[in-house]
């Protein structure tokens, strides 16, 4: 039986052309008034997934 893609992970992680994994940063959804502008600016954009997690996440996405 084929392994299914883990949809929760698929919605959160994108694979680049070179095979790296990118994710959005946490702490930028709500309650932003109390956070300094410097912090919210720093949290913009995407970040590489930690090297320790890459293998496991690729397996969840069916790309291992």
Swiss-Prot record:
Residues 21-36 have a biased composition (Basic and acidic residues). Residues 1-14 have a biased composition (Basic residues). One of its GO terms (molecular function) is structural constituent of ribosome. Pfam families: Ribosomal_L35p. GO terms for biological process: translation. SUPFAM superfamilies: L35p-like. InterPro entries: Ribosomal_bL35, Ribosomal_bL35-like, Ribosomal_bL35_sf. One of its GO terms (cellular component) is cytosolic large ribosomal subunit. Residues 1-50 are annotated as: Disordered. It comes from the Bacteria. Keywords: Ribonucleoprotein, Ribosomal protein. Belongs to the bacterial ribosomal protein bL35 family. PANTHER family: 54S RIBOSOMAL PROTEIN BL35M, LARGE RIBOSOMAL SUBUNIT PROTEIN BL35M. This is Large ribosomal subunit protein bL35. It comes from Corynebacterium diphtheriae (strain ATCC 700971 / NCTC 13129 / Biotype gravis).
């Amino acid at each position: 039986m084929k392994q299914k893609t883990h949809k929760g992970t698929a919605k959160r992680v994108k694979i680049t052309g070179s095979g790296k994994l990118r994710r959005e940063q946490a702490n930028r959804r709500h309650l932003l008034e109390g956070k300094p502008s410097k912090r919210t600016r720093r949290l913009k954009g995407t970040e590489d997934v930690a090297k320790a997690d890459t293998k496991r996440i690729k397996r969840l996405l069916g790309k291992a």
